[in-house]
Amino acid sequence: MNSKHLVGGLGMTTTGEQVTVIVYPYRLPKRLKPLTECVLETQKNFSNEAIGTVLLLCIDPKAKFELVCRNDLRVVIVPPNHPLFRETLETMPRLCGFVHLVYAALHDLASGIASSKVFAYAVNQCPNDYREWSKGIGDEADEVLSYIIAELSTDPKFYRQFAVFAD
């Protein structure tokens, strides 16, 4: 995993603090050091003033709400069952396809269809059809999701709403 696989944007807290919001659509790794290094690398694409707090929205159902600090970087891991997860998605600029993908995975997790697995879905604007687009789990899903992000990033509207972080 590297920074080109992360999607997100800049947000503002209710207290006016600028934060970086990143959607992390994979299982959370057991060791968080490589992940925080990747986030730090991602931050550099924003400029130094963005370094501070990162909200990492994680769709891994086993993730716990926690704060991880590395150097000057504070990463807040926000699991899908935490109120901050939904609130943050709702206040971010809409990338309807990607948000649909995240919610599709969350819907299945909540329904027990994939109780311990996170699926990656190809983006499909017909909500009833997304299960047909299931592409597997684990590394295979990571590759599919990377492909989806790459495809979306060619759309000019994508850049106006969200940032795609590339190496």
Which positions does each model-derived feature cover?
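Charge-rich (often acidic), low-complexity intrinsically disordered regions concentrated
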Residues: 1-167
